[in-house]
UniProtKB/Swiss-Prot annotation:
A GO CC term attached to the entry: photosystem II
Keywords noted in UniProt: Chloroplast, Membrane, Photosynthesis, Photosystem II, Plastid, Thylakoid
Keyword Plastid set for record: yes
Function: May be involved in the regulation of photosystem II.
Family: Belongs to the PsbP family.
Subcellular localization, as worded in the UniProt entry: Plastid, Chloroplast thylakoid membrane
Record-level GO BP terms: photosynthesis
Protein name (database record): Oxygen-evolving enhancer protein 2
Induction notes from the record: By light.
Length: 43
C-alpha cells in the first residue's frame, strides 16, 4: 500500500484517487496490503 500526497503515474497501470490517500495498482506492483481479491486476479 502506497500513500502519497500526489497522484502517481505508472506505465501500463492505473491509479485510484482515494480521499486522504492514494492507492496505486500495477502489473508489477500488487496491492497485497490493500485487497486480497486484487492478488487473486494476478495469480
Amino acid at each position: 500500500k502506497k500513500q502519497t500526497g500526489f497522484t502517481p503515474f505508472i506505465g501500463n497501470g492505473f491509479s485510484l484517487d482515494v480521499p486522504x490517500s492514494i492507492t496505486e495498482y500495477g502489473p508489477x506492483e500488487k496491492x497485497e496490503d490493500n485487497f486480497d481479491a486484487t492478488n487473486n486476479l494476478f495469480v
